[in-house]
Swiss-Prot record:
Binding site for Zn(2+): C69, C71, C87, C90
Gene expressing this chain: rpoC1
Superkingdom, taxonomy of origin: Eukaryota
Main localization of the protein described in the UniProt heading: plastid
EC number per UniProt: 2.7.7.6
Compartments (UniProt record): Plastid, Chloroplast
Subunit structure: In plastids the minimal PEP RNA polymerase catalytic core is composed of four subunits: alpha, beta, beta', and beta''. When a (nuclear-encoded) sigma factor is associated with the core the holoenzyme is formed, which can initiate transcription.
Keywords from the named record: Chloroplast, DNA-directed RNA polymerase, Magnesium, Metal-binding, Nucleotidyltransferase, Plastid, Transcription, Transferase, Zinc
GO cellular component annotations of the record: chloroplast; DNA-directed RNA polymerase complex; mitochondrion
Gene Ontology biological process terms, A to Z: DNA-templated transcription
Protein name from the UniProt record: DNA-directed RNA polymerase subunit beta'
Length: 678
């Protein structure tokens, strides 16, 4: 077996019978070797204990309870002073019960059986390696016909094979009837070969290097012939060349991995550990078993039925033996791959049995679901939608998901606040969705970040941390700027949410994984949280303003004698029918909320003197003088009021409400960023 502390990789391949025995065999103190499963039984119906030498035998697979044998005796696990290591009465080893997750057994087959993956899967490795049609091998494996051995010294009727092929074909079903079991074995071993044993002999005979050389020579000869002028023949030659290439690659693979081709025929059938094919007791005392157990039982029944006449009986007809070998082959095929290129086997409720191939392949198979990816607790999954009102570091969790993810924390809060006396009452309050539950949930979520992950996670920005808040609905809300880091779109994409439990995980999420801490691409350093699509359109509409410019209106805002453009004086702003003046951005936004001005209407906003906006070489468009000596220099986008001594009294900039809103958002973001790092 593979040591999990030393090996970081896994290779899957065919196994020799010696290795299968080494995995399963154990030697008892009395010298008895155990490991072979010989009985098709599981548990005794009275004692509810595993049957000896059955599919759940404690001698073969280990004890059900750690350190307790089948007799009920107890030994301390790992104590070298405790002796013996095996129970003298039942032969069960005193070890941890977890051994039943990896301790294997085996079934000794009465006849060789081809592995259905290598025979019926396309392309068929056996047919490719031996360069014969697949139908011939299927007929040979399932005992539909036999072939003569070339080394027969005392032929009986097969010497007539060349001349009387049709006659022999008509008698192939009647000839075995004249032989008893012993006589048929002698006849078959001497002159004919059938079943998987015939395949095994053919796989063991040829040299792989000779196969490679002959195939390469034939491929070169076909390539030198060129086109024949017949399209059908050319296609046939092309298919033959492709087949030879596959055959060469297959032979080289066997040579490179040092695997013997005859391993594609099974003599020993491994039995999975019991914990991987469990029998579970459900409500009402009923038992629910894995389908693989039933398929193993079927194999053992048929194998024992074949073993009995081969070892004891001397009068069983040879036809019966061949028929039973076919049944064993079909039982093993069903165990390994039920329904491969045929009708699957079903139970009494017309349900298809789940074979070993069904357990390991597909999205819900052992590899993709359990080994390559695992389902974990404290996690959920839902569709993502835009949350435009969210902060960059926040995400919206639906109430249904949040109460499940933080249920244990809510239960602890209910018990601490003496709202519930135990876990059962707390869960009932959560099911009833009482108001106190949502209050405690919000308190828990305030100090607990969550991790959002979108598959495939190709770089570190594929999983980021957020501060969750409760939202209505069933979708996860996200700030649109974090979309690019996840490579997500709001068109039905789904994301997984995880809750970091340990303090170390929470600290890592806060310091390294928060979305506002990952604004730059880790590969090239460019900003990755940049506005796109509708965000750019919104910013464009917000800041486009009125493009007429200041020269489009020759109105003098400081001329109080102009009766057509009256000004309304107020403590905070001066408003005209043309372009109003405001002392602060808050006054301008207040006027917009009161619908006195539009989003893109030009206005004059008083600016701070410490923030200079004057270009060094810019010349004013117009200069206006007042009677008190002050004058106004009007530029394209700002206005300066100066005293008689040319001192700047105040500055007004020409802007819009959209520009003011955009500026305030950026200013608040920068101030918040500075406070976070101060």
């Amino acid at each position: 077996m593979i040591d999990r502390y030393k090996h970081q990789q896994l290779r899957i391949g065919s196994v020799s019978p010696q290795q299968i025995r080494a995995w399963a065999n154990k030697t008892l103190p009395n010298g008895e070797i155990i490991g072979e499963v010989t009985k098709p039984y599981t548990f005794h119906y009275k004692t509810n204990k595993p049957e000896k030498d059955g599919l759940f035998c404690e001698r073969i697979f280990g004890p059900i309870k750690s350190g307790i044998c089948a007799c009920g005796n107890y030994r301390v696990i790992g104590d070298e002073k405790e002796d013996p290591k095996f129970c003298e009465q039942c032969g069960v080893e005193f070890v941890d019960s977890r051994i039943r997750r990896y301790q294997m057994g085996y079934i000794k087959l009465a006849c060789p059986v081809t592995h259905v993956w290598y025979l019926k899967r396309l392309p068929s490795y056996i047919a490719n390696l031996l360069d014969k049609p697949l139908k011939e091998f299927e007929g040979l494996v399932y005992c539909d016909f036999s072939f003569a051995r070339p080394i027969a010294k005392k032929p009986t009727f097969l010497r007539l094979r060349g001349s009387f092929e049709s006659e022999i074909q008509s008698r192939k079903y009647s000839i075995p009837l004249f032989f008893t079991t012993q006589g048929f074995d002698t006849f078959r071993n001497r002159e004919i070969s059938t079943g998987a044993s015939a395949i095994r002999e053919q796989l063991a005979d040829p040299d792989l290097r000779i196969i490679t050389d002959h195939s390469l020579v034939e491929w070169k000869e076909l390539g030198e012939e060129g086109s024949t002028g017949n399209e059908w023949e050319d296609r046939k030659i092309g298919r033959r060349k492709d087949f030879l290439v596959r055959r060469i690659e297959l032979a080289k693979h066997f040579i490179r991995t040092n695997v013997e081709p005859e391993r594609m025929v099974l003599c020993l059938l491994p039995v999975l550990p019991p914990e991987l094919r469990p029998i579970i007791q459900i409500d009402g005392g009923k038992l629910m078993s894995s389908d693989i157990n039933e398929l193993y039982r079927r194999v053992i029944y048929r194998n024992n039925t074949l073993t009995d006449p081969l070892t004891t009986s001397t009068s069983t007809p040879g036809e019966s033996v061949m028929c039973q070998e076919k049944l064993v082959q079909e039982a093993v095929d069903t165990l390994l791959d039920n329904g491969i290129r045929g009708q699957p086997m079903r139970d009494g409720h017309n349900k298809v049995y789940k074979s070993f191939s069904d357990v390991i392949e597909g999205k819900e198979g052992r590899f993709r679901e359990t080994l390559l990816g695992k389902r974990v607790d404290y996690s959920g999954r839902s569709v993502i939608v835009v949350g435009p009102s969210l902060s960059l570091h926040r995400c919206g969790l639906p109430r249904e998901i949040a109460i499940e993810l933080f249920q244990t924390f809510v239960i602890r809060g209910l018990i601490r606040q003496h709202v519930a006396s135990n876990i059962g009452i707390a869960k009932s309050k959560i099911r009833e969705k009482e108001p106190i539950v949502w209050e405690i949930l919000q308190e828990v979520m305030q100090g607990h970040p969550v991790l959002l992950n979108r598959a495939p996670t190709l770089h570190r920005l594929g999983i980021q941390a957020f501060q969750p808040i409760l939202v209505e609905g069933r979708a996860i809300c996200l700030h649109p700027l974090v979309r690019k880091g996840f490579n997500a779109d709001f068109d039905g994409d789904q994301m997984a949410v995880h809750v970091p439990l340990s303090l170390e995980a929470q600290a890592e999420a806060r310091l390294l994984m928060f979305s506002h801490m990952n604004l730059l691409s880790p590969t090239i350093g460019d900003p990755i949280s940049v506005p796109t699509q509708d965000m750019l359109i919104g910013l464009y509409v917000l800041t486009i303003g009125n493009r007429r410019g200041i020269c489009a209106n020759r109105y003098n805002p400081w001329n109080r004698g102009n009766s057509q453009n009256e000004r309304v004086n107020d403590t905070n702003y001066m408003y005209t029918k043309k372009e109003p003046y405001f002392c602060s951005s808050s006054d301008a936004l207040g006027a917009y909320r009161q619908k006195r001005i539009n989003l893109d209407s030009p206005l004059w906003l008083r600016w701070r003197l410490d923030q200079r906006v004057i270009a060094s070489r810019e010349v004013p468009i117009e200069v206006q003088y007042e009677s008190l000596g002050t004058y106004h220099e009007i530029y394209g986008h700002y206005l300066i009021v100066r005293s008689i001594k040319k001192e700047i009294l105040c500055i007004y900039i020409r802007t819009t409400v959209g520009h003011i809103s955009f500026y305030r958002e950026i200013e608040e973001a920068i101030q918040g960023f500075c406070r976070a790092y101060s």
